């Protein structure tokens, strides 16, 4: 299983140079300019290989009851993608997901009209088809590949699931 951390790569390199002290191997690939989160998968194609992968946004802190167990379960994901959601007061500030009968029915980035109060946290797990799906994305109006568009590709083929992060405790 591989992980991609997308944000502040130089700071991470200083703190965790190669991972040897932790008994793991860490590799770094940097985007030369902002092209969106899914671009990390395209850049990391050789690194990912046939492995499943996680994407962790490095400017977030994740905690919550039973989070370790949920992460261990998520690493076992064999097909599809999983996002972690958290209830928020101002969903218009986040990418959000609407869930019905344990299925994600809508994913939207910073919706102007209320859809749901379940924010996408920046903690994702993907099968190795993520590179293939990312390569098929078209840049948004911002000129970047959007994570919401990638998640919608998985939703379209019925391979997107969600888990929840509650308050710590």
Ranges and model annotations:
Residues 1-57, 62-69:
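Conserved N-terminal catalytic core of the sugar/cofactor nucleotidyltransferase
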Residues 7, 99, 125-126:
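A conserved hydrophobic position in a structured secondary element of the catalytic/binding core
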Residues 57-58, 84, 126-127:
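A secondary-structure boundary/capping signal
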Residues 23-25, 49-52, 77-81, 93-94, ...:
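Short coil/turn connectors at secondary-structure junctions
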Residues 89-93, 98-102, 110:
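Ligand/cofactor pocket segment of small-molecule handling proteins
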Residues 64-92:
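Conserved donor-nucleotide/metal-binding helix-loop-beta segment in metal-dependent transferases, i.e.
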Residues 17-23, 98-99, 153-155:
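Short, conserved catalytic or adaptor-binding loops enriched in Gly and charged residues
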């Amino acid at each position: 299983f591989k992980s991609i951390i997308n944000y502040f790569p130089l700071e991470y390199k200083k703190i965790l140079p190669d991972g040897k002290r932790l008994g793991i191997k860490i590799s770094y690939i940097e985007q030369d300019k902002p092209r969106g989160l899914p671009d990390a998968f395209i850049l990391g194609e050789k690194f990912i290989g046939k492995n499943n992968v996680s994407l962790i946004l490095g400017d977030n802190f994740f905690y919550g009851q039973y989070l370790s167990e949920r992460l261990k379960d998520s690493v076992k994901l064999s097909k599809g993608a999983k996002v972690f959601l958290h209830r928020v007061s101002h969903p218009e500030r986040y990418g959000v997901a609407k869930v019905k009968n344990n299925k994600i029915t809508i994913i939207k980035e910073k919706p102007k009209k209320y859809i749901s109060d379940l924010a996408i946290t920046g903690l994702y797990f993907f099968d190795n088809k993520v590179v293939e799906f990312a390569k098929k994305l078209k840049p948004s109006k911002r000129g970047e590949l959007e994570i919401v568009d990638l998640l919608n590709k998985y939703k379209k083929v019925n391979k997107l699931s969600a888990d929840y992060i509650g308050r710590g405790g």
